[in-house]
Amino acid sequence: EKKRVLELLEMVGLPEAALRKYPHEFTGGQRQRIALARAVALRPKFVIADEPVSVLDLSVQAQVLNYMKRIQEQYKLSYLFISHDLGVVKQMCDELAIMYRGRFVEYGDRQDIYLNPQHIYTKRLLSAIPNLDPGNRELHKRLRREIESEYKQSMESYLAKDGRVGDLIPL
């Protein structure tokens, strides 16, 4: 058993000394890596990752996502990756399903969703991805304002008469 625990710690980049630490002695990123090791300890084929990096800063997010990808390749497992951050989702997922108010509103491969979003909620999520290029900040702000305006003007068309999200319609 200890051999397996050491293997799992190594898999997520933690030293053997981590065995002797209390939970409060780990950073947030280390805790997420431990959670990842626990999730794959029994060698599952499928892991549900619900907002796995949402509370982490960007550099630590990248580390955890890299460990997740490496483990995915090593164990040939699939993730159901749940997140509001489509910038993170883009790095992790080949296929996406967008949910709004508890219903699927859009489904497609990564390229379809990112290059040609159909639902206004998808457009809003995409516009929330920070643009790090200072030369494009004004353009990004303008696009966000346009999407917000479209949302306010047309949101009713995305809802059924009872106020629920309409059915998912294939394109």
What residue spans do the PLM features occupy?
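ABC ATPase "signature
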Residues: 104-108
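A short, surface-exposed alpha-helical micro-motif characterized by mixed small hydrophobic
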Residues: 89-91
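Hydrophobic anchor residue at the start of the ABC signature
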Residues: 36, 64
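A short, proline-enriched helix->beta-strand linker immediately N-terminal to the Walker B motif
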Residues: 41-45
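Short catalytic/signature loops enriched in Gly
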Residues: 110-171
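Conserved ABC ATPase "signature" region
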Residues: 2-17, 126
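Conserved ABC ATPase signature
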Residues: 22-26, 30
